[in-house]
Structures are given as C-alpha cells and as structure tokens.
C-alpha cells in the first residue's frame, strides 16, 4: 500500500 497525501496529511 502506498502513502497518499490528503489535505496535507500523510496516510499510509
């Protein structure tokens, strides 16, 4: 699973 940047937050 890749990390994504959403609303300035990094979610992995």
UniProtKB/Swiss-Prot annotation:
Its GO CC terms? extracellular region
Organism's domain of life?
Answer: Eukaryota
Q: What is its main location?
A: secreted
Keywords (A to Z) from UniProt: Secreted
Q: Where in the cell is it found?
A: Secreted
- Name the tissues where it is expressed: Expressed by the skin glands.
Can you say what this protein is called? Skin secreted peptide 3
| Organism of origin | Ascaphus truei
């Amino acid at each position: 699973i890749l990390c994504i940047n959403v609303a300035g937050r990094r979610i992995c």
